[in-house]
């Protein structure tokens, strides 16, 4: 039934949101996030996800949205990874990019996954994107400031090496642990309580909260 499908997908969404705030956001973090989330999936939710992904796991697809960046056929999804706003702006006050942004992307993914008319290939593609974008949502530099392009124009030294603030958040910090994603997953603090229901209106609050950290 559609109701059950939506509930399972929203449950997965909330699990990711509950866990990702403990991580930084390179490929290792995306995989670790998905590994931990998989521990909390009910059997029915896991079966539904396996059906949509046709045997792939949420861990293996968690970097898919980054992996396809090098393929020009997917150029239109480039802007879906981030939102750039003025320092004192809330998302409601912005003029969304015609090319889309992270907020638009997550809602688009949910629309497809909840649609009766979506094909199997569409559901698979947009679930892969959603899994990744939930991770991007909680990386402050992915909801950053116009003037520094989400930290990409803030150049820093990281243990003597040239880097930028975005890269430090994305990968430098987590790579410093020298741990695999499975090791990270085992060492992450886990939420004491998970809420099953997710209201889509809450998404804009998450966007604004993350932006406040930039």
Task: State where each predicted segment sits.
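Bacterial Sec-dependent N-terminal signal peptides
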Residues: 1-32
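Residue-level micro-sites within transmembrane alpha helices that shape
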Residues: 9, 137-138
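N-terminal, motif-rich segments that launch catalysis or mediate targeting to/interaction with membranes
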Residues: 24-133, 140-214
């Amino acid at each position: 039934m559609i109701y059950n499908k939506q509930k399972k997908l929203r449950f997965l969404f909330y699990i990711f949101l509950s866990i990702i705030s403990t991580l930084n956001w390179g490929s290792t973090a995306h995989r670790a996030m998905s590994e931990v989330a998989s521990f909390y999936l009910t059997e029915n939710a896991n079966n539904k996800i396996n059906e949509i992904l046709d045997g792939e796991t949420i861990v293996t697809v968690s970097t898919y949205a980054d992996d396809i960046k090098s393929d020009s056929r997917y150029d239109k999804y480039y802007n879906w990874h981030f939102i750039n706003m003025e320092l004192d702006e809330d998302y409601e006050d912005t003029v969304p990019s015609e090319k889309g942004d992270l907020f638009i992307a997550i809602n688009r993914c949910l629309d497809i996954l909840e649609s009766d008319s979506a094909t199997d290939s569409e559901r698979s593609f947009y679930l892969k994107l959603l899994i990744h974008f939930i991770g991007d949502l909680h990386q402050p530099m992915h909801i950053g400031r116009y003037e520094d392009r989400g930290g990409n124009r803030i150049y820093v030294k990281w243990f003597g090496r040239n880097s930028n603030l975005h890269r430090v958040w994305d990968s430098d910090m987590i790579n410093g642990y020298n741990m695999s994603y499975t090791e990270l997953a085992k060492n992450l603090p886990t939420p004491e309580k998970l809420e099953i229901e997710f209201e889509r209106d809450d998404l804009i609050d998450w966007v604004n909260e993350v932006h406040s950290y930039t």
